[in-house]
Amino acid sequence: MALLQLLLFAMLAACGFSEEQTEGITIAYKVLEVYPQSRRVLITCDAPEASQPITYSLLASRGILVAKKVVHDSVPASFNINITIKSSPDLLTYSCQATSNSGTYGPSSRLQMYQELWAKPVSQLQADFVLRHGDSGPTVELSCLASSGSPPITYRLVGNGGRVLAQQRPLHGKPANFSLPLSQTTGWFQCEAENDVGVDSSARIPLPRAEARAKLVTTLAGELPLTPTCILAGSLVSIAVIASRMLSSTGL
C-alpha cells in the first residue's frame, strides 16, 4: 500500500501546475520531490498586468505572511515550501498578493493542497448486517465503515449483478446505514466505498433462498424453530425429574 501511495504522489509530481486565478493574479503549485514523510512543493504567483517591479507576498491561512519576493521582470515569483506529513489542512492553505506602482492585485483564490498531497485510498472496509422482521416482512440492515481513506467517502449498497441499490455520503468517520427488504433483491449484496483515490468492496453476503425465507419470517417473528423447542422441552422435563428425586430423598 505504501508503494502505491508513493507512485500516486510521483504521478502528481510529474503533472503540470495546478492553478487558481482571481482578480488579475494567479497562484499555482507543483510537487518537486516526494519523500515518505514530506513533500517539496514549488508555489508560483503571477500578476501579468502589474507594472514592474512587482512585490509578491505568499500568504497562509488568516492572511499570515509566509514569504515575500520582489520581481523585476515578467517571470512569476517562485516559493519553495517544505511540507511534512504532520502539517494540518490549515497550514496547507495559501494565497498570493502582488503590489506595484499600478496597484494591488489579489489576494488570489485560496490554494488548498491537503487532499491532493496526502490523499489515501479507501481501505479496511467493514460491513456488518442484521436481519430484522418488520410489518412488510424481513429486512436486512447493513452498516458500512472504512477505517482508512481520505474524505469524502461515498458508500454504496450493491446487489446481485453489480446493481446499486442505495448510496450515502455520511460525515467522515461515521458509518453508512442501509435498510433493504429481502423481497427486493436476491442472490447477494455487498458494501462498496469510494473516494477520489480508489474503491474498496466488502465480501459478498449471500441472501437466503426463496424456500428459506418463509421459515426466516417465522423465526424473526419470535417463534422458536422446531428443534430448539424440543431441546428446551426435554431440558425442562429433566430438571423436573431431578428436583422430584431431591425432594424424595430429603423426606419432604
Curated annotation (Swiss-Prot):
Q: Where are the transmembrane segments?
A: none
GO BP term, example: positive regulation of immunoglobulin production in mucosal tissue
Q: Which residues form a coiled coil?
A: none
Cellular component per GO? Answer: extracellular space
Q: Kindly list every residue the record annotates as glycosylated.
A: N82, N177
Its primary localisation, in coarse terms, equals secreted
Q: Indicate the secretion signal residues.
A: 1-18
Report the superkingdom from the record: Eukaryota
Question: Null phenotype?
Answer: Mice are viable and reproduce normally. Show reduced number of both peripheral lymphocyte B cells in the spleen and precursor and mature lymphocyte B cells in the bone marrow. Show smaller and fewer Peyer's patches, lower numbers of immunoglobulin/IgA-secreting B cells and an altered gut microbiome. Exhibit reduced levels of immunoglobulin/IgA in the serum, gut, feces, and lactating mammary gland.
Keywords (alphabetical) are: Adaptive immunity, Cytokine, Glycoprotein, Immunity, Secreted, Signal
> Which Pfam families would you find in this protein's record?
Ig_C17orf99
UniProt-recorded name of the protein: Protein IL-40
